[in-house]
Amino acid sequence: MASRSLGGLSGIRGGGGGGGKKSLSSRNAAVERRNLITVCRFSVKTLIDRSCFETIDDSSPEFNNFAAILEQILSHRLKGQVTWFGYESPRSFWDYIRVACRKVSQNCICSIENMENVSSSRAKGRAWIRVALMEKHLSEYISTALRDFKTTRRFYEDGAIVLGEEANMLAGMLLGLNAIDFSFCLKGEGLDGSFPAVIDYTPYLKYIQSSDSISSDEEELRTLGSSGSESSTPENVGPPFLMDENSWFNKCKRVKQKYQLTLEQKGYLEELLRLRENQLSESVSQNKILLQRIEDSDLAHKLEKEQLEYIIVELQDQLTVLKNNDLRSRQELTAHLTNQWPSPGALDVNAVALDTLLYRKHNKQWYEKSYQSLDQLSAEVSLSQTSLDPGQSQEGDGKQDTLNIMSEGKEDTPSLLGLCGSLTSVASYKSLTSLKSNDYLASPTTEMTSPGLTPS
């Protein structure tokens, strides 16, 4: 039991130690991120102040320090590149910028990739910082890269500055650099990527003594002065008055420093406000232009819709008129054909056709006669024509001889039925059909010799 309890206590201690290490590492990472962001903000302010008096170039210590700080921020907890053997090789922040900033319009990525005097990734990253500052698009590049969270997550580990809340602060503080005109030489020694960048913290380290510590120092001096002499003479009263004067001077100096710092912050915020106002005015103007375009397009679409509807209505009217005209034409054509070809009862007495044969058949004049061949039928028709019209007997004889010659060698088949009879009326065709059904064959020569070819 004792061994078990000791083991449990040791396990609890071990777990507490692991949790303490984890909290300590997270605290160190947070302090590191905060230090880099704070130093970057100071560096931006010093660059803005220096730009009021001189041009910022590669020889400016403020710019060199800013470039080193930005390089450290973009390289913070950057993942290494895994090789084929499973090892991680160091990687530069340029590999991340090259992928994440390709969506920026009119970017300089391809230009930096094609530079002849720059070969290493670190040197290309430093050249990109200088080109982006000269183009005044550094803040836009950083904002676009941070918005691509998937790519950022792929290149950086947990706890990196670009993955935390400090990333938004970084993109905001870099906006102030758009008001500075930079001038860099992309062939200088500053692009040498053989050594890492080192941050100089000394311009930003100043010891400021608090008012409580100053008062405590004065009390100590008074105590020491009073313990050195028991008599209170005017000579012994002098040092406290001098210390009071020095303390007021120190307080005035501190107030002046705070005022200068506030004035610098005010200038930075005013510049940032001007940039935001310009961006807002541009956005408003673009919004107005887009709204006007939308209204114009809506109006054009409405007009086009009305025109199409009018065209549809007009086409429907035309289609209705054409249908009516077509129906009227059909009716007129039917009436014309009906009036032009008379009925069988109104035919002339001299017109001889198959209707006459049908009439004689019904009167049992030819009831006992049957024609066995086409020649017999044509002869009988010619005899009947001669008996009806004696004046045309001679002419009919000549035509009959011609038809007999033409009919020689032809087969008595139903295919010749279409050539029989007169087409003067529909009743002739119906009479032909009735003759066929009663096994009667009409001679095709009757039509040629019949005077009923033409309508009366």
Curated annotation (Swiss-Prot):
What Gene3D superfamilies does the record point to?
Answer: 1.20.58.900
What are the record keywords, sorted? Answer: Coiled coil, Methylation, Phosphoprotein
Q: Which residues form a coiled coil?
A: 300-325
Q: What SUPFAM superfamilies does UniProt report for this protein, alphabetically? A: RUN domain-like
Question: Domain RUN, which positions?
Answer: 57-189
The chain residues annotated with the modification Omega-N-methylarginine are: 13
Fetch the InterPro entries from UniProt: Run_dom, Run_dom_sf, RUN_RUNDC3B, RUNDC3A_B
Q: Does this entry carry the keyword Phosphoprotein?
A: yes
Instruction: Enumerate the residue ranges of region (Disordered).
Output: 1-26, 382-405
**Domain of life from the UniProt record:** Eukaryota
Q: Name one Pfam family in it.
A: RUN
Phosphoserine PTM positions read: 215-216
Q: Where is the composition biased (Gly residues)?
A: 8-21
Xref: PANTHER family: RUN DOMAIN-CONTAINING 3 PROTEIN RUNDC3, RUN DOMAIN-CONTAINING PROTEIN 3B
What assembly does the database describe for this protein?
Interacts with RAP2A.
What family does this chain come from, according to its entry? Belongs to the RUNDC3 family.
Q: What is this protein called?
A: RUN domain-containing protein 3B
What organism is this sequence from? Macaca fascicularis
